[in-house]
Amino acid sequence: MCEVFRRLPGTAPGSSPPAPATHRLRLLGRELRVRRFMIFCRFWAKMATNDAVLKRLEQKGAEADQIIEYLKQQVALLKEKAVLQATLREEKKLRVENAKLKKEIEELKQELIQAEIQNGVKQIPVPVQSDTPVQASSAVSTSVIQSTSVSTISCSIKEHSKGGGEEKKVKEKTDKKGEKKEKKLQSAAPSADSKPVDVSRLDLRIGRIVTVKKHPDADSLYVEEVDVGEAAPRTVISGLVNHVPLDQMQNRMVVLLCNLKPAKMRGILSQAMVMCASSPEKVEILAPPNGSVPGDRITFDAFPGEPDKELNPKKKIWEQIQPDLHTNAECVATYKGSPFEVKGKGVCRAQTMANSGIK
């Protein structure tokens, strides 16, 4: 029986077919070579792609390092700028404080000089120090000061050793000198206190309460804005909560003392005082005459004169005048019997309180 077979590649025509085992080995070897070649190609392709990725990563890392370094520099600059600004602010603050302290020192020095002059102490002018002092000159000046201080101390010891009689003479001479200097100062000083201490020193005016409310930090005080004929109303603090209802304060015409030194009352500056008839049991606001307008001046026929611009609290002028302010038997406000008068319009009075004090 004839055996028919397919001719394999690589067999010559008419040749006999190869043995089956040899043929399989050849096929396997050829397939292995093909697979090795494919694996080798894939490996080199992967290596090429990995190199590109690594290069990109290295480039990104370098860029990130540069950005981080730049940010560090910016943070350092910002810190330096903040420290510089804080230093400048502190320096400015210290300069202002130093200027205030210098001013206070100069004021205290002037007060001390005036007190020494009044007590008869002889004043010796102090040499002004130059802007560019030399160490040698400063040393000489200190030595001179030390020598003068030593000499003055020795002289004082000698004077004390001479006895009490000479001390008495020296004291009498200094007292006489002090009296002469005081007389000169009194004659040279402006005659501000030559005015009599009476009601003419008070700036009493008519005012109208524009707004009123309770003090935020005090239950017994009102805070009022009062028109006294000036460009802007004045803020006035009054202790009238327990005596006058709030609705009766609004738009009310009042008498104001306008030249007291402004003072803070529970944190709010009061620029005037509402005048009231007052007793331990009762308080009534003084009523101006009909037809009065804000800014009208209150005068006293028996006490003419112009009021002080501002009463000096050290002189106690208000404290000396106030005890003579009273309402008379007809409830008219008076000073030593002379009524509170608005020229051409009438007198000021309390509603019901007769023969009571005014403050």
Swiss-Prot record:
The keyword Methyltransferase does not apply. The keyword Membrane does not apply. InterPro entries: NA-bd_OB-fold (IPR012340), tRNA-bd_dom (IPR002547), Tyrosine-tRNA_ligase_regulator (IPR051270). Cleaved by caspase-7 in response to apoptosis to produce EMAP-II. The modification N6-succinyllysine is found at residue 316. Residues 149-163 are annotated as: Required for endothelial cell death. Keywords: Angiogenesis, Apoptosis, Cytokine, Cytoplasm, Endoplasmic reticulum, Golgi apparatus, Inflammatory response, Isopeptide bond, Nucleus, Phosphoprotein, Protein biosynthesis, RNA-binding, Secreted, tRNA-binding, Ubl conjugation. Residues 157-185 have a biased composition (Basic and acidic residues). The modification Phosphoserine is found at residue 187. It is found in: Nucleus; Cytoplasm, Cytosol; Secreted; Endoplasmic reticulum. Residues 100-241 are annotated as: Interaction with HSP90B1. GO terms for molecular function: cytokine activity; tRNA binding. One of its GO terms (cellular component) is cytosol. Pfam families: tRNA_bind. Homodimer. Part of the multisynthetase complex (MSC), a multisubunit complex that groups tRNA ligases for Arg (RARS1), Asp (DARS1), Gln (QARS1), Ile (IARS1), Leu (LARS1), Lys (KARS1), Met (MARS1) the bifunctional ligase for Glu and Pro (EPRS1) and the auxiliary subunits AIMP1/p43, AIMP2/p38 and EEF1E1/p18. Interacts (via N-terminus) with RARS1 (via N-terminus). Part of a complex composed of RARS1, QARS1 and AIMP1. Interacts (via C-terminus) with SMURF2. Interacts (via N-terminus) with HSP90B1/gp96 (via C-terminus). Interacts with PSMA7. Interacts with TARS3. Non-catalytic component of the multisynthase complex. Stimulates the catalytic activity of cytoplasmic arginyl-tRNA synthase. Binds tRNA. Possesses inflammatory cytokine activity. Negatively regulates TGF-beta signaling through stabilization of SMURF2 by binding to SMURF2 and inhibiting its SMAD7-mediated degradation. Involved in glucose homeostasis through induction of glucagon secretion at low glucose levels. Promotes dermal fibroblast proliferation and wound repair. Regulates KDELR1-mediated retention of HSP90B1/gp96 in the endoplasmic reticulum. PANTHER family: AMINOACYL TRNA SYNTHASE COMPLEX-INTERACTING MULTIFUNCTIONAL PROTEIN 1, TRNA-AMINOACYLATION COFACTOR ARC1 FAMILY MEMBER. This is Aminoacyl tRNA synthase complex-interacting multifunctional protein 1. The lineage of its organism: Eukaryota, Metazoa, Chordata, Craniata, Vertebrata. The gene is AIMP1.
